[in-house]
Amino acid sequence: MLFSYNWLQEYIKGKLPAPAKLAELLNMHAFEVEALRQAQGKKDWILDIAVLPNRAHDCLSHTGMAREIAAICKLKLQLPKTKQIKVQKGGLAPLKVRVQSTELVPRYTALLIEGVTIGKSPTWIAERLEAVGVNSINNVVDLTNFIMLETGQPLHAFDYEQIEGPFDSAQGKLMNVREAKEGEKLETLDNQIFSLPRGALVIEDAPSTGSGQAKRLIDLAGIKGGKVSAISSGTKHILLQAANFNAATIYRTKSQLKYTTQAADIYAHQIDPNLTMEALERAYALCAELGIGGKIVQVVDLYPKSASWRTKRIALDMQFASSILGIPLSQKEAKRILESLDCQVALTKNRLQVTCPTRRLDLTMQEDLVEEIGRIVGYETIPAAFPIAPITPPSKNIELLWLSKIRNALKGLGFTEVYNHSFIGDKDFSPFAYSATDKEKLVEVENPLSSEFSHLRDSLLENLLKNVRDNQKKTETIRIFEVGNTFRRHKGKFVESNMLSALIYNGSFYEVKGVCDFILNGLGISSAWYDEYQATSEESRATIWHKGKSAEIKVDGEKIGFLGEISSRVNTALKLSKPVGALHLNLQKLILLASEEISYQVPSRFPASTRDIAILVPFQTKVAEVMNAMNGAGGPLVRDIDLFDMYEGEHLAQGKKNLAFHIIYESSDRTLTSKEVDTLHNQIIKAVEENPEWEVRK
């Protein structure tokens, strides 16, 4: 925010430090001064100060910043004069304001002023505004901008005659403060027409019964006034509004509209509702000075939850404060500092009873008070000292160690780790075949940055597949993986899972299975097996996998993930030209099963013999079924069976596929003769042919 040096000086008794020195002090004790420049023919200096979000509620104003400067420089603060509001009798129809929700509008205050004069502002106020980048328009509009920049409370002025309703009747006029409906239109003071999102705060007027006129939106509350009620040179009566609006609602609306104002930026950080009347009293005091004149004929003040905005009391233990700061601290010095920040302090034995002003929303516990004391004293004045504490080795984080091992294993296999957003959007539902039930289990983001980030991801695979889609033209094969959290609804609760997913573009089921075996072996998991894929809604979605080329990964009956090829439907939707193999593992379950114990098997000193076998089986037959039959028939002398080819296509009967295996025979205590190997191999052939649907090809 831009601050005028001359303007700040008005609220300080005594001379401020030179502009450069003041900037240095603010940098050391409060906020970063991002820029310092001269303005207005070198009569003033402008400080561009980066007010931190946790102090925006009280320091996005010249009086707020002056209060900080007074505390830092040990100077006295002199606040601007206000004027007690006096209501006089007038001829205007009274105003009634209805607020839809006190959560959305904690306080609504306004002054109805009759008989104002619209004209040019005095030179001094025009110069003040222009110094900080605000154009002077007329005395009423300049008043609202000046009060906002001085006090931190945004104001807005309505032309009261432009608010629909009876003008001079006892019935009065009516304004409603409510949430907008989706798509409602409003034209703002700067001639922009907005189609409003649902939930935006708006103010509408209410024409008199029988007038035939519809209700109109006259204000985008907290952000920008409506054009229909704008102040003009012919304005005679004004409604001067100072309200307190819900910070989250204003922030969401300005983000959705991609439109903001200085008032909206202030409201979006939440401010003290008690500021509204203070700002109106200050505005009333300036009306005569700015030539506005007029008389107040009505005060509106809706503040139903005023009790919840009372001052807070915090007990500060002096011994605690000294130990945190690392310096001896007297009660007297602590009291002086806190009082300079507008706190009220009462001394007790070894404690301070501190009453914090309502504007300081950031002061909630004694640690906050210690921080305030520390920064005003100056962190640079606190002597550096080495911490005195026993040096103990950190505890072993088993989860991180196993995760590092998994990452290294995948990188060793040629995979690249990627990091994606934790979101998916509406456009992902169709290509990834989300059903209505799938969508219900997604976690919707309340305030998404865009439609592309409308939901939290329920799987890592979708974004990985989009990575493949965007990079497939650059290379023949892609190997990527991601570690991250997924989110879903299950039985009325939010479930968050830590997952690992890997993709091989131009890869097959068996290639991915080999990767999975390598990872599991590296984690000491030897009891893994693969079962027919039967995805449940809380674990994965069947629609993303290729039916017949996917499997569940199990360890001792515990499901730990899925692997297989991505369905042709998804490939077509994403325009992927090659098949994609995928692996999806639950890291939490996987790490619980991992073991550092590695069993060592002495390799045989005797040579092995290899035989090949080709078997014609029905298309739906699982490879594991055939391998189990061969292992059972061969006994302990069958050291390994590997599938090296699977053929489906021409020259085979319909509904059939050909499986080709290497069978390795080996003994640990002797060299097997050819006759022994042939006998074992024939046993396996016989066992296979016992199944009438299987045929050994010779």
PLM feature spans:
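Broad gene-expression machinery/nucleic-acid interaction feature
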Residues: 44-48, 92-94, 108-110, 174, ...
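A carboxyl-terminal module marker
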Residues: 2-3, 340-349, 493-495, 506, ...
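Class II aminoacyl-tRNA synthetase-like tRNA-binding/catalytic domains
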Residues: 176-207, 215-231, 381, 388-496, ...
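Short beta-strands and strand-coil junctions in structured, solvent-facing domains, enriched
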Residues: 55-57, 227-228, 247-248, 360-362, ...
